[in-house]
Amino acid sequence: MAKIKARDLRGKKKEELLKHVDDLKVELSQLRVAKVTGGAASKLSKIRVVRKSIARVLTVINQTQKENLRKFYKGKKYKPLDLRPRKTRAIRRQLTKHEQGLMTKKMQRRSRLYSMRKFAVKA
């Protein structure tokens, strides 16, 4: 089997991709048997190509799965941890902009009664 391109795989359904992976795995096992029994050099070099092809198909499956999950959870309040943006622990614990702007009743009263003084500079 020739080297496959990821862009060719993206349009296919998951069942087709899984069947493709199974076919590639069967081919890989045949190539490994040929390696043990002393097969041709062309077959030995093909092992690497087939392994990479399997990885490529599985990568496309995982990417499409994650993309569908992102669409499903878009706009929802809670998301799975692996779909949330990656941040450090300290950043996750910071106050939000809204929380930073909140004031107690006492602070609101104080800012209303004693607002910031404005001075005019006489030139």
Curated annotation (Swiss-Prot):
Organism annotation: Ictalurus punctatus
Designated gene of the protein: rpl35
GO molecular function terms listed in the Swiss-Prot or TrEMBL record: mRNA binding; structural constituent of ribosome
Principal localisation: cytoplasm
Upper lineage: Eukaryota, Metazoa, Chordata, Craniata, Vertebrata
Pfam families on file: Ribosomal_L29
Keywords: Cytoplasm, Ribonucleoprotein, Ribosomal protein
Assembly and oligomerization: Component of the large ribosomal subunit.
Role, per record: Component of the large ribosomal subunit. The ribosome is a large ribonucleoprotein complex responsible for the synthesis of proteins in the cell.
Family of the protein in this entry: Belongs to the universal ribosomal protein uL29 family.
GO term, biological process aspect, one: maturation of LSU-rRNA from tricistronic rRNA transcript (SSU-rRNA, 5.8S rRNA, LSU-rRNA)
Cited PROSITE patterns: RIBOSOMAL_L29 (PS00579)
GO cellular component entries: cytosolic large ribosomal subunit
Location within or outside the cell: Cytoplasm
Tagged with keyword Cytoplasm: yes
Protein known as: Large ribosomal subunit protein uL29
